[in-house]
Amino acid sequence: MAFQGTSRTLTQQSSAASSDDLQKILFSPDAIKKMATECDLGRHHWMRADNAISVRPLVPQVTSNNLLSFFKSGYDAGELRSKGYMSVPQVLCAVTRTVSTDAEGSLKIYLADLGDKELSPIDGQCVTLHNHELPALISFQPTYDCPMELVANRHRCFAVVVERHGYIGYGGTTASVCSNWQAQFSSKNNNYTHAAAGKTLVLPYNRLAEHSKPSAVARLLKSQLNNVSSSRYLLPNVALNQNASGHESEILNESPPIAIGSPSASRNNSFRSQVVNGL
């Protein structure tokens, strides 16, 4: 995957003349080449026995120098509000194994700040993957913006750290790590808030029900149910009750049907309920 990006976050806070300088810093052929060779952006990095620990900064050294000079000059001249921040919304790492599942080993992958001498994981964002768990897709999200500054003669920026453990007897490549991200630079930093994990319930949706017509039996049952709910029953010598409560009580108190041909059938024939609205 080739490096792609825009300079909107920079050009919105700088003049037109400065925009050309920014595009040269970020998107010149040399800058794009450095992003690939020094940072392995969109490239497969092989984890070997002779390369057990890999620290890949998200910004090349030359690009960091140019950005640091650009923001510092703008800040000293009063044109920019700060000396520059680096933000990375997300770092996506695709990890695949290149040995059989029987190999005993693991990879430890995390996001670090080069300003930290110990290279500790940022807010505990660290993943340990055993060989039999690969392949896997990992996502890291920094929780703050990294200032563009020098710390002990080191350019401060985010970095992806991969450590290989185990794999006794395997001197070659045991896993491949392909990382992708899009770094953004601005004179104004962002505010980050903690969000609790949530769950969204997704109900199944029957799309065929919209295009299929109900059967004749289903239509008949539906019409009968509608008529029963709106019908009024009239008993002999009983006035018609227009209230809903009276209607419900009459339905509940209705006598069970009498079998045709029984001795009481003719005697009770005149006492059958008469349906006003009809079924």
From Swiss-Prot:
Q: What is its subcellular localisation?
A: Host cell junction, Host plasmodesma
Which keywords belong to this entry?
Answer: Host cell junction, Transport, Viral movement protein
The processes (GO biological process) annotated in the record are: transport of virus in host, cell to cell
Q: Where in this protein does the record put region Disordered?
A: 256-279
Keyword Manganese attached? no
Biased composition of type Polar residues is found at 267-279
Is rRNA-binding given among the entry's keywords?
Answer: no
Q: Which GO terms describe its cellular component?
A: host cell plasmodesma
Renumbered to this chain, the Low complexity biased-composition regions fall at 256-266
Family assignment from sequence similarity: Belongs to the cucumovirus movement protein family.
Q: What does this protein do?
A: Transports viral genome to neighboring plant cells directly through plasmosdesmata, without any budding. The movement protein allows efficient cell to cell propagation, by bypassing the host cell wall barrier. Acts by forming a tubular structure at the host plasmodesmata, enlarging it enough to allow free passage of virion capsids.
User: This protein is called what?
Assistant: Movement protein
- Which organism is this entry from? Cucumber mosaic virus (strain S)
